[in-house]
Amino acid sequence: MGETAEGVEAGEKYVSIPQLAGVGTLLSNGGKEIPLSSIEGKRICLFFSAHWCRPCRNFTPKLLQIYRKLRNTCKNMEIIFISLDRDEISFLDYFKGMPWLALPFDTGLRQKLCVQFDIEHIPALIPLSTTLSHGFRVEEDAVKLVEEYGVDAYPFGAKRRSELEGMDDARRQGGNLLQLLGCKEREYVISADGIKTPISDLNGKTIGLYFGAHWCPPCRAFTKQLREAYDELKALRPGNFQVIFISMDRNEEEFQASLSAMPWFAIPYSDTTVQELSRIFTIKGIPTLLILGPDGKVFKTDGRRIISKYGAMAFPFTESRAYELEEVLKKERDSLPHRVRDHRHEHELELDMAKAYLSTQLFHQTPSVQPCRLNLKTLREEYHLIFTNSNRKTSRPQSSYTRQQRDLNNLYSDPKHLPQLHKHFDQSNVATAENSLRFLNGEPENSDISSIHVAFADLAGKIRGEDDKRD
């Protein structure tokens, strides 16, 4: 089937009309026989598919929409359906929803064509580019191209694929927010209250492109973290940082539910830019936060990690800022004791969990790092690790502790109090956490005391008060 000749690259495949079908006629949707000669001069796509195949059933409506658009614009193309259904009844039932042509149902013929066109999976859409002297040139499977670019993928060949990828590169690297976030019909972003803001107003700002969805629990959790950082930056650095939500929701209702919890902007749900941005930046999972610098170019693809770890302190989200924060945390971590003694144990106990927790969540006020609010979601995730060893104590004598420190130390060493401590911890709020942080920051000289004893001393006081009432 392949041939090498002047003007033809080795390895290219060509087929003639007789080779293409192996039959004299094609079928129309109504069952009418169409002469094979009717497709001469047209751009042909071979559609290998079957009704029993779910990906095929999902792809067919997309192809149908593109086909109608192209035919309405007088594009000289035709699709030929090659059925891999199990029987003729299934083939006819599937074909009745297709406006294009089909080969007659023939299991032997389809097997031959699958070998001829290297079909290893379905759906498969094989474009055939016409040439003057070699019949039809066989192109690569275009299913992915059609799914990613829609009608813009036409005429579905390698040349068009290269053009589209070049256009994506230009949008990704060009630094033009209007070209990146807008389209012909829209030069604005929207907010939850319906206000339209010109994309040009975002020029010169640091932008977070947030890919998420309401149905995704990690997205809902990260939205809360991102909002905390966003609100803090809005107060401390007004106008410097903005977020654009790109919805991966399944419908408009879910999109509105997502947007209702967000104080920032969004791309409209039904806008084609949503799919384009997901393709341009190769989004593989959600939540994903990309950071664009004031020049409009992406310089950080792991915005979720840096926001979750540092919050607003990470701004402007550069590598140098992340390094600075890590150095501060390292000094904080290294200042903590590695081991403590417990009078009930002969050996020393390691404080790895508490130390690791403190190093990533609690920050002393220093010239280079501003105080931050505790992230309660993280606290709730970590508390079961923090309180696992109910016998742990520090080596300092109890007489040197403050009353708050003694409260928590006593509760910590008595297993019967742990359920109460857990209950209060789960019911704590931001104010409680901030009070704990202020208490910690107010006594830097006590850094040799277990960080947990200090940080949650106010919770212990509440529990002690309940114990006093019961007694």
Swiss-Prot record:
Residues 15-173, 179-334 form the Thioredoxin domain. Its EC number is 1.8.1.8. Keywords: NAD, Oxidoreductase, Repeat. GO terms for molecular function: thioredoxin-disulfide reductase (NADPH) activity. PROSITE patterns: THIOREDOXIN_2 (PS51352). Probable thiol-disulfide oxidoreductase that may participate in various redox reactions. This is Probable nucleoredoxin 3. The lineage of its organism: Eukaryota, Viridiplantae, Streptophyta, Embryophyta, Tracheophyta.
